[in-house]
Amino acid sequence: MSIVTTEHPNAALVRRGYVAFNTADLETLSELCHEDACWHTPGRSALAGSYQGREAVFGHFGQYGGLTAGTFRANLQAVLTNEDGTVVGIHQNTAERDGRTLDVRCCVVFDIRDGQLVDGREYFFDLHAWDEFWA
């Protein structure tokens, strides 16, 4: 007897999003993100805040790569889903900047509606380390 499992479409969307993010594939990210999407990054660093609209969100993402000379990565470890459109992605953020190394686990709660990301909220396992890296 074999067990067949099917991945929820929202989980597949999030997996595609991580690949697109890590390869700076703006075409795919544009397809996956609603034009009015919101992104929320906690903390006290200059990157903390809420970003409204696809262009603002992408500008925020661009800072991650730009401030780290392209070394920033979000290495996906797990994806959890439920039927209401919510997906949780757990990943390890890594980067190098000004002689410092970032290695912080994070989860993002994604709200997916009609096949597009409408809201993303980051939660860091060590918010202090995250903020210190960007200081």
PLM region descriptions:
Residues 22, 95-97, 112-114:
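Beta-strand elements of well-folded, non-transmembrane domains
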Residues 29-32, 82-85, 110-117:
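Short, solvent-exposed coil/turn segments at beta-strand boundaries
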Residues 50, 99-101, 128-134:
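A short, polar/proline- and glycine-enriched secondary-structure boundary/capping micro-motif
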